[in-house]
Amino acid sequence: MATPNEVSALFLIKKYLLDELSPLPTTATTNRWMNDFTSFDQTGFEFSEFETKPEIIDLVTPKPEIFDFDVKSEIPSESNDSFTFQSNPPRVTVQSNRKPPLKIAPPNRTKWIQFATGNPKPELPVPVVAAEEKRHYRGVRMRPWGKFAAEIRDPTRRGTRVWLGTFETAIEAARAYDKEAFRLRGSKAILNFPLEVDKWNPRAEDGRGLYNKRKRDGEEEEVTVVEKVLKTEESYDVSGGENVESGLTAIDDWDLTEFLSMPLLSPLSPHPPFGYPQLTVV
């Protein structure tokens, strides 16, 4: 059961709350409130009634007959202003195991080159001399004035230098060195152009020339010998082996050098030389 002090305290709280909602109360409402308060003090309460008939006091909802203005529309707004809850759902971050996508740049656009143009630019020739100058050949030296000299060491003269000449290009000087090296050392020589040996092999050419010369000389000697024999036979037949003058004329026709080179004949030879009669041996 509530005591009078508790009832008065509740009433003051109700007054405080409801008066705050109406900042400009009317005089009629204040008079009614005062009359109710005085009647509440005069009548009093019996504590036995509170025990038998308990009542529930609504402090939030005011009575419509006491207040002229509408409070229902303002109380929810006040409650809404005083009690506001913000519900922010937690963010769930899910880390995926997928790799980031690769960034592949598209290929460049194909450019077509037009070869047939109106004014084609003349192409400059590639200098070949520069490449030849950079290469070093065996036995070749470059002179300060731009020409090339070829030299070789002669093994038969204790390695003395043999001058081969001065050439316009390094290739010509290298070929001159190769020819001389092959002539001195043969197949043991180290050459700049070993594949060109067959073109300028001096020994092969000299051997062929000597063989041909000897062959021609042998044919000429055979012809001369046949002619000499025929001449001697004719002279012998005409003279009959007794005319000395015919033999002398035949000797005059021969060359003196050929006569001296002939071999000596024996007296026992069946052929009488130079028209003399054959000697008989007893």
Swiss-Prot record:
It comes from the Eukaryota. GO terms for cellular component: nucleus. Transmembrane segments: none annotated. The keyword GTP-binding does not apply. InterPro entries: AP2/ERF_dom, AP2/ERF_dom_sf, DNA-bd_dom_sf, ERF_plant. The keyword Transmembrane helix does not apply. It is found in: Nucleus. Residues 136-194 bind DNA. Residues 77-100 are annotated as: Disordered. CDD domains: AP2 (cd00018). Signal peptide: none annotated. PANTHER family: DNA-BINDING DOMAIN (PTHR31190), ETHYLENE-RESPONSIVE TRANSCRIPTION FACTOR ERF105 (PTHR31190:SF499). Probably acts as a transcriptional activator. Binds to the GCC-box pathogenesis-related promoter element. May be involved in the regulation of gene expression by stress factors and by components of stress signal transduction pathways. Belongs to the AP2/ERF transcription factor family. ERF subfamily. This is Ethylene-responsive transcription factor 6. The lineage of its organism: Eukaryota, Viridiplantae, Streptophyta, Embryophyta, Tracheophyta.
